[in-house]
């Protein structure tokens, strides 16, 4: 069976973009078992409470939930197991260096298939304070209101 081309998003972490300001993003592969890949292809995954952490010079993804494959047998995987992230050595060293700075962490933003390979987009993030979240919400509401007004003006409806 040939691999499909393009990018098919399986799961995205919307809460990460709300709780953190993303400074930089990277694309990483994941070391997965066969049943994990099949479960991902079925569109079943959750990135809630997931994070990446350094151990022995490698990066590992903790807390990502991939449910057991429905048609799997005794070879099924553990849903919340730690998964190794596959990156170049230079990228790993750069990420480890950034996380050693105060207040920075690595969070997964989305899981997707790129040309048939399971990938995770990870971001170097800094936690937002509650007032930052309120400011972002106010900005988003203002942008939405501007777009709504522009849409009315384009349709010939005046306020």
From Swiss-Prot:
Function: Required for rescue of stalled ribosomes mediated by trans-translation. Binds to transfer-messenger RNA (tmRNA), required for stable association of tmRNA with ribosomes. tmRNA and SmpB together mimic tRNA shape, replacing the anticodon stem-loop with SmpB. tmRNA is encoded by the ssrA gene; the 2 termini fold to resemble tRNA(Ala) and it encodes a 'tag peptide', a short internal open reading frame. During trans-translation Ala-aminoacylated tmRNA acts like a tRNA, entering the A-site of stalled ribosomes, displacing the stalled mRNA.
Family of the protein in this entry: Belongs to the SmpB family.
CDD domains found in the cross-reference section: SmpB
Gene Ontology molecular function terms on file: RNA binding
One GO biological process term: trans-translation
Protein name: SsrA-binding protein
Key words, A-Z: Cytoplasm, RNA-binding
Compartment(s) where it occurs, according to its Swiss-Prot or TrEMBL record: Cytoplasm
Entry's Gene Ontology cellular component terms: cytosol
UniProt entry tagged with the keyword Disulfide bond: no
HAMAP family to which the protein is assigned, alphabetical: SmpB
Lineage: Bacteria, Bacillati, Actinomycetota, Actinomycetes, Micromonosporales
Database matches in InterPro entries: SmpB, SsrA-bd_prot, SsrA-bd_prot_CS
